Regions:
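Short hydrophobic/charged patches on amphipathic alpha-helices used for structural packing
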Residues: 13-17, 132, 157-158
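Short secondary-structure boundary segments
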Residues: 28-29, 172-173, 224
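Alpha-helical scaffolding within the catalytic cores
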Residues: 11, 153-159, 203-210
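His/Asp/Glu-enriched short active-site or ligand-binding loop at hydrolase and phosphoryl-transfer sites
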Residues: 128-150
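A short, structured surface patch at a secondary-structure boundary
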Residues: 1-19, 23-35, 39, 143
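Pocket-lining segment of extracytoplasmic ligand-binding domains
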Residues: 143-158, 164-191
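C-terminal lobe and pocket-closing loops
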Residues: 177-213
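Extracytoplasmic substrate-binding proteins
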Residues: 38-120, 152, 211-278
Length: 279
């Protein structure tokens, strides 16, 4: 069974008791709320076990441990172990090459979080966690990491202009159902390139964003927002690394990797668009 979003509502222990799940899996971002509200204690009392995983806050640190746990509880250890080996190999390759860069070879990057989700409004960004980790691991210098020590926060467009980033990234997804009037770049399994390109062009024409040198020179990438909450986060690292350092990663093919992962490790058919650059 699934439950209402515990980030936007209180978790109902009563509902859990009625449904009698064998296990409830929570994201680590809910841990403090679950403790403070007494939910964890109540679930323990009624004998419902809980598993905490993290693909969101410190994804590159905790994905391996989270996948190992999921492999155990779902009796899929061989599959989980194979995924972990592939995951570690791909990330290690990126890290080894990025380690050869001098500090001045790491371009500055501003990443706009959920760009356009609330219309023309700008800008939220990522700090040292989540996509901030992806950028730094991929050989970039995330501007938000200097502003926020955790997941991120809000900056005004004047700050973005003043930072004059070498590259401008933005995250997007198909939020059309839950966010009325969204202008976000639709990315994910049900999206198409033509629609995503049109939405991206509109966001790049916003006042303040359209004056950025990175935008004028098309050093721009839109990337799937939910990469930061999935074990496929290494694909985002690969795609960003290749975008920032095309010569260094000319033999890396993130598109082939994401298709291969779906075929080998999931029950999902690959489809859609997960990142793009402006035409």
């Amino acid at each position: 069974p699934t439950f209402d979003n515990p980030y936007t509502s209180d978790f109902s222990v009563e509902s859990a008791v009625v449904r009698q799940p064998d296990l409830i899996i929570f994201d680590i971002g809910l841990l403090s709320k679950l403790k403070d509200s007494g939910v964890l204690t109540q679930l323990e009392k009624v004998g419902i076990p809980v598993l905490i995983i993290d693909f969101r806050q410190q994804p590159l640190t905790n994905t391996v441990a989270s996948m190992a746990l999921l492999g155990k509880v779902f009796d899929e250890q061989p599959n989980a172990d194979a995924f972990i080996r592939f995951y570690q190999q791909r990330l290690e390759l990126v890290r080894q090459r990025v380690a050869t860069l001098k500090p001045e070879q790491r371009p500055s990057v501003f990443i706009e979080r959920s760009a356009g989700i609330k219309g023309e409004q700008c800008c939220n960004t990522f700090g040292k966690g989540s996509f901030g980790q992806f950028i730094d691991t991929a050989g970039g210098d995330n501007i938000g990491s200097k502003l926020f020590s955790d997941m991120g926060g809000e900056v005004n467009v004047e700050q973005v202009i003043a930072s004059n980033p070498d590259f401008y990234l933005l995250t997007g997804a198909d939020w059309s159902r839950g966010h009325r009037g969204t202008l976000a770049v639709p990315l994910g399994y049900t999206t198409d390139m033509a629609t995503s390109q049109k939405k991206l062009a509109h966001l790049l024409d916003r006042t303040g964003i359209n004056v950025l040198k990175a935008v004028k020179e098309k050093r721009v990438m839109a990337i799937y927002h939910q990469f930061y909450d999935t074990p496929l986060n290494f694909i985002a690292v690969e795609a960003i690394a290749k975008f920032l350092h095309p010569a260094l990663f000319k033999d890396i093919d993130p598109q082939a990797d994401i298709e291969s992962v779906h075929q080998k490790f999931t029950a999902l058919d690959y489809s859609g668009v997960f990142w793009l650059t402006p035409q």
